[in-house]
């Protein structure tokens, strides 16, 4: 086996923590990201320095899924513009991912430090990103979170290459994808509109990156009153869906027509008409001599410092508003069924009673009894698990199941298991849990992550009638977890509300 890890699905042959420390010296934490801590590690045998990402399994299913996803994707890829996987260890409590160490700077910092910056410099950056993305797309891998923060220089040499990092959201395109994820300002229209999507979303993001590098401005942005986040979000998604951006004067006055043409083709609203990464590499602005050599540093840097140093547009998008925007196409169809569901769930056993009654009405008395028993026996366990997750440092570890948003440490957003939004910590939108199941040897379904604190149930034990009688609560009022994350305090609730929360949680447990 080329790396130190065991097969991800193996439940027995874990690495011992000593295997990690015997081979690597781990320094102090140099950065904390959404799902992991990042260390600078030294190989005791070769003396080489690497980046180590440590994921704690106890932080929830989202974290375990992110680690497994990044490991799986990085094992598949080998490209000069992608940070390469060096080693992996999986212990009972952690995932350790060792990567090449990039010692260069982020692209923004590099631009600000240059005495001379032109379209040709931008063309060189975009070309390398396109080549890496074209390679990923040839493997049917969608990165889904391309942004300037994930582009770094490999070293500090003058002609250093660009490398792409952060693959925890990358996904194999086995059919079109529906779950929304990414960073809001880089989201393609099909993601905002909750359509099925695929590789073209990466090309849209490259168009946004190119727009910023040439003008210093994000394409979808306008000045709003301080803290007027709701209008910011509303305008952001409206403009993305319409492709409403312009090449404003004076910022684009010195930019070539060829550059504008490539941006336009990358940011085509209709995904089936959008230029591919492979096609973009052949564009005259990338492969020809159409990129201007005129110095545009002063104008670009002034706008970068205005828009990005203050980081206004990069601030975490407000949870509730973004959830409503991303779920807008579903909202009208689920509002009526949600009202009926709320009326049928007045107390602690409301969910179980409603399910049992519906099953009985459908002629499945035995199924109704099973539904009631399942909800009753698992309600307490679901509430206990929810309580544990709320007490955890990662408030986003347990997604809400009522369509509400569950904020994390900075109010940014990630979708939960039902397509609702729970917060991340870097402004990106990420799927919360892995709903897939690992088939056991006897044909039963077992949960994909055995370390989860929330008990799972076999899908065969769930009555079909109950599932049909319990509509997805897609647009319910935000629950106590969401309010707690937004205010820093748990809101007061009546016993009836607590009991309803238990019933809702039990439904989530059953469907997981």
Swiss-Prot record:
Instruction: Locate the Phosphothreonine modifications and list their residues.
Output: 446, 470
Q: How does it sit in the membrane?
A: Peripheral membrane protein
Q: What is this protein called?
A: CaM kinase-like vesicle-associated protein
Q: Where is the composition biased (Polar residues)?
A: 398-439, 449-460
- Known partners and oligomeric status: Interacts with calmodulin, in the presence of calcium.
Q: Name one GO biological process term.
A: regulation of modification of postsynaptic structure
PTM annotation (Phosphoserine): residues: 392
Query: Where does it localize?
Result: Cell membrane; Cytoplasmic vesicle membrane
Q: Which UniProt keywords apply?
A: Calmodulin-binding, Cell membrane, Cytoplasmic vesicle, Membrane, Phosphoprotein
Its UniProt domain note says: The protein kinase domain is predicted to be catalytically inactive.
Q: Gene encoding this polypeptide?
A: Camkv
Cofactors, names only: Ca(2+)
Q: Where is the composition biased (Low complexity)?
A: 332-347, 461-478
Q: Give a short account of what the protein does.
A: Does not appear to have detectable kinase activity.
Q: Which Gene3D superfamilies match?
A: Phosphorylase Kinase, domain 1 (3.30.200.20), Transferase(Phosphotransferase) domain 1 (1.10.510.10)
Lineage per the UniProt record:
Eukaryota, Metazoa, Chordata, Craniata, Vertebrata
Matching InterPro entries: Kinase-like_dom_sf, Prot_kinase_dom
Q: Which family does it belong to?
A: Belongs to the protein kinase superfamily. CAMK Ser/Thr protein kinase family.
Q: Return the GO cellular component terms, semicolon-separated.
A: cytoplasmic vesicle membrane; glutamatergic synapse; plasma membrane
- All copies of domain Protein kinase, residue ranges: 24-286
Which Pfam families does the UniProt record give? Pkinase
The molecular function GO annotations come to: ATP binding; calmodulin binding; protein kinase activity
Region Disordered: what ranges? 328-347, 393-512
């Amino acid at each position: 086996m080329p790396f130190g890890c065991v097969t991800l699905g193996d439940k027995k042959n874990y690495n011992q923590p000593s295997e990690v420390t015997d081979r690597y010296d781990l320094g102090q934490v140099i950065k904390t990201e959404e799902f992991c801590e990042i260390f600078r590690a030294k190989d005791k045998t070769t003396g080489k320095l690497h980046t180590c990402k440590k994921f704690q399994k106890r932080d929830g299913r989202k974290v375990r899924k992110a680690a497994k996803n990044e490991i799986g994707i990085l094992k598949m890829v080998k490209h000069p513009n992608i940070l390469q996987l060096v080693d992996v260890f999986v212990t009972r409590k952690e995932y350790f991912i060792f990567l090449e160490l990039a010692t260069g700077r982020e692209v923004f910092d590099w631009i600000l430090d240059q005495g001379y910056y032109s379209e040709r410099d931008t063309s060189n950056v975009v070309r390398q990103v396109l080549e890496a993305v074209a390679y990923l797309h040839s493997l049917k891998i969608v990165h889904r979170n391309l942004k300037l923060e994930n582009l770094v220089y490999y070293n500090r040499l003058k002609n250093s290459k660009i490398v792409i990092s952060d693959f925890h959201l990358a996904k194999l395109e086995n059919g079109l994808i529906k779950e929304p994820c990414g960073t809001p300002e880089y989201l393609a229209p099909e993601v905002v509109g909750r359509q099925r999507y695929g590789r073209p979303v990466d090309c849209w993001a490259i168009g946004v990156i190119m727009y910023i590098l040439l003008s210093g401005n994000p394409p979808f942005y306008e000045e709003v009153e301080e803290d007027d986040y709701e209008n910011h979000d509303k305008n952001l998604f409206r403009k993305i869906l319409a492709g409403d951006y312009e090449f404003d004067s004076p910022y684009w006055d010195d930019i070539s027509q060829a550059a504008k043409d490539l941006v336009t083709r990358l940011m085509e609203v209709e995904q089936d008409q959008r230029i591919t990464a492979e096609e973009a590499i052949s564009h005259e602005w990338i492969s020809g001599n159409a990129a201007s050599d005129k110095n545009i540093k002063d104008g670009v840097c002034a706008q970068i410092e205005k828009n990005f140093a203050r980081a206004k547009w990069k601030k975490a998008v407000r949870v509730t508003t973004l959830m409503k925007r991303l779920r807008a196409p579903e909202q009208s169809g689920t509002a009526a069924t949600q009202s009926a569901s709320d009326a049928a769930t007045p107390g602690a056993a409301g969910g179980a009673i409603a399910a049992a009654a519906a099953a009985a009405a459908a002629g499945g008395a035995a199924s109704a009894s099973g539904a009631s028993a399942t909800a009753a026996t698992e309600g307490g366990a679901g509430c206990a698990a929810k309580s544990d997750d709320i007490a955890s440092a990662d408030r986003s570890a347990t997604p809400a199941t009522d369509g509400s948003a569950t904020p994390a440490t900075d109010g940014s957003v990630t979708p939960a298991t039902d397509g609702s939004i729970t917060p991340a910590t870097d402004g990106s939108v990420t799927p919360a849990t892995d709903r897939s199941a690992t088939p056991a040897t006897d044909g039963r379904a077992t949960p994909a992550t055995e370390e989860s604190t929330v008990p799972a149930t076999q899908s065969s034990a769930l009555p079909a009638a109950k599932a049909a009688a319990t509509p997805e609560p897609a647009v319910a009022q935000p629950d106590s977890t969401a309010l707690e994350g937004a205010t820093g305090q748990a809101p007061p609730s009546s016993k009836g509300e607590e009991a309803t929360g238990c019933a809702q949680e039990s439904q989530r447990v059953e469907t997981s």
